[in-house]
Swiss-Prot record:
Joins adenosylcobinamide-GDP and alpha-ribazole to generate adenosylcobalamin (Ado-cobalamin). Also synthesizes adenosylcobalamin 5'-phosphate from adenosylcobinamide-GDP and alpha-ribazole 5'-phosphate. GO terms for molecular function: adenosylcobinamide-GDP ribazoletransferase activity; cobalamin 5'-phosphate synthase activity. It catalyses: alpha-ribazole + adenosylcob(III)inamide-GDP = adenosylcob(III)alamin + GMP + H(+); alpha-ribazole 5'-phosphate + adenosylcob(III)inamide-GDP = adenosylcob(III)alamin 5'-phosphate + GMP + H(+). Keywords: Cell membrane, Cobalamin biosynthesis, Magnesium, Membrane, Transferase, Transmembrane, Transmembrane helix. It is found in: Cell membrane. Its cofactor is Mg(2+). Its EC number is 2.7.8.26. It comes from Saccharolobus islandicus (strain M.14.25 / Kamchatka #1) (Sulfolobus islandicus). Pfam families: CobS (PF02654). It is an enzyme of class 2 (transferase). Its main location: membrane. This is Adenosylcobinamide-GDP ribazoletransferase. Coiled coil: none annotated.
Length: 253
């Protein structure tokens, strides 16, 4: 495994200032490990910031954390969310939907989907609270959301217009099983249901557009994160390997 390709994952998926001259092909080649490397790294940073903010702002720390979450991601996936929202609002043939997906202007569909995301995200972050489990909620949610975006790229053929989608699909199409195995420590019974339902919805959307793309994967990562986080908070990560390890840690100490 080349260090250059691994470090390039940070410059591609986040706003963390790590210089890399890796090509898109090299990034795509190692992207299957990004849920573990990038997902856990982001969760650790978010947890540290949240702890500091909570000491000052208490429950309102979740609102500030929303900005931190998007800032760490460089707002990259938000662009995909806005584009997908515009495409979903288009009535008509596939060509018109793809034009909206590629359009740089933001329409009512993009704004609408953004409001849906912000509403769910704010509720999830306000409910985050402060406990021993907070960091594990964030780790699980980051890993799961990144995995579902990459799993979509690996299992659904890309639209002809998406160069990024083609590159990632070619590099990931043999890695879908690996992506699922990476989930084992972090996914609960309830999140399996969320994962499957979310994937089926995105699969149907991809069919209407003619395939997957970088925008669709980015939108999936963005929109699924608060859903997984909210599920983790409500169910306390029950029936997951991560929760078992937490219980053992607390019991032994």
């Amino acid at each position: 495994m080349r260090l250059k390709g691994v470090l390039a994952l940070f410059s591609f998926f986040t706003a963390i200032p790590i210089k890399s001259n890796a090509s898109l092909e090299e990034i795509a080649e190692y992207s299957y490990i990004s849920p573990l490397i990038i997902g856990i790294s982001l969760a650790l940073i978010e947890s540290a910031v949240y702890v500091l903010l909570y000491r000052i702002l208490e429950a309102l720390a979740g609102i500030v954390l929303l900005g931190v979450v998007e800032l760490l991601r460089g707002f990259n996936h938000l662009d995909g969310l806005l584009d997908l929202g515009d495409a979903l609002m288009i009535k008509g043939d596939r060509e018109r939907k793809i034009k909206a997906l590629k359009d740089v202007e933001i329409g009512s569909g993009g704004i609408g989907l953004l409001l849906v995301y912000l509403s769910i995200q704010i509720v999830a972050l306000l409910k985050l609270g402060f406990s021993f489990y907070t960091i594990f909620y964030l780790i699980s949610s980051n890993v799961l959301s990144m995995t579902i975006g990459l799993y979509i790229l690996s299992t659904i053929s890309p639209i002809p217009e998406s160069n990024l989608g083609k590159i990632f699909h070619n590099k990931l199409k043999g890695k879908s099983t690996v992506l699922l195995f990476e989930l084992i420590p972090f996914i609960s019974l309830y999140n399996i249901i969320v994962f499957l339902v979310f994937y089926m919805i995105m699969h149907k959307i991809c069919r209407s557009l003619g395939g997957s793309s970088g925008d669709i994967a980015g939108a999936s990562i963005t929109l699924s994160f608060p859903l997984f986080l909210l599920t983790n908070e409500i169910t306390n990560l029950n029936y997951s390997l991560l929760s078992i390890l937490c219980y053992l840690f607390l019991y032994l100490h």
